[in-house]
């Protein structure tokens, strides 16, 4: 039992890694998504709130897979170079290629029409590019808060 608890709270714990990634995604996507939907896409506050509420459980399900996907993209990018530009570009590519299809499905589910979906997803892509690797930095910050090991080598325990 003691070993199980120690491994659960280890910096290499899958549970700790998943919780950190989930926290980061729910917070970031709620704030940024609502701003884009209301101020750029022209969605009503009610539509955006519905979208964000639907997105929370979706983000909880996809957060850790996204974190693993991002880590894989970052490892591939590290083969190209170690500089900040390569890292930022890899973060943007990982975020856009993983999140855009999920975001479009959420908007469709909450009743946004096709032009709103196209505008919101396109705007999200542009904003993601303009903000650089903001989510990647936020994710890394949350992982540090949760004391998850950098580059997240995940153990087989808990």
From Swiss-Prot:
Topological category with respect to the lipid bilayer: Multi-pass membrane protein
Cystine residue pairs: none
Membership in a protein family: Belongs to the AlaE exporter family.
A GO cellular component annotation in the UniProt record: plasma membrane
TM regions (residue ranges): 23-43, 53-73, 92-112, 117-137
Transmembrane helix as UniProt keyword: yes
Cell compartments where the protein resides: Cell inner membrane
Chief place where the protein resides: membrane
GO terms assigned for molecular function: L-amino acid efflux transmembrane transporter activity
Stated name of the protein: L-alanine exporter AlaE
Highest taxon above the source species: Bacteria
Function, in words: Exports L-alanine.
Organism: Cronobacter sakazakii (strain ATCC BAA-894) (Enterobacter sakazakii)
Signal sequence bounds: none
Lineage, uppermost ranks: Bacteria, Pseudomonadati, Pseudomonadota, Gammaproteobacteria, Enterobacterales
Gene: alaE
GO biological process: amino acid export across plasma membrane
Assigned keywords, A-Z: Amino-acid transport, Cell inner membrane, Cell membrane, Membrane, Transmembrane, Transmembrane helix, Transport
């Amino acid at each position: 039992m003691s070993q199980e608890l120690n491994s659960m709270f280890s910096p290499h714990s899958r549970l700790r890694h998943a919780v950190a990634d989930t926290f980061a995604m729910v917070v970031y996507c709620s704030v940024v998504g609502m701003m884009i939907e209301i101020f750029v896409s022209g969605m009503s506050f009610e539509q955006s709130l519905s979208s964000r509420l639907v997105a929370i459980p979706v983000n909880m399900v996809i957060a850790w897979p996204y974190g693993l996907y991002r880590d894989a993209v970052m490892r591939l990018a590290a083969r190209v170079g170690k500089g900040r530009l390569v890292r930022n570009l890899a973060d943007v590519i990982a975020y856009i290629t993983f999140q855009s299809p999920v975001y479009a499905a959420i908007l469709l589910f909450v009743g946004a029409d096709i032009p709103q979906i196209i505008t919101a997803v396109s705007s999200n892509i542009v904003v993601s590019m303009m903000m650089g690797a903001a989510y990647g930095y936020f994710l890394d910050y949350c992982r540090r808060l949760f004391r998850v090991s950098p580059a997240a080598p995940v153990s087989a325990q808990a």
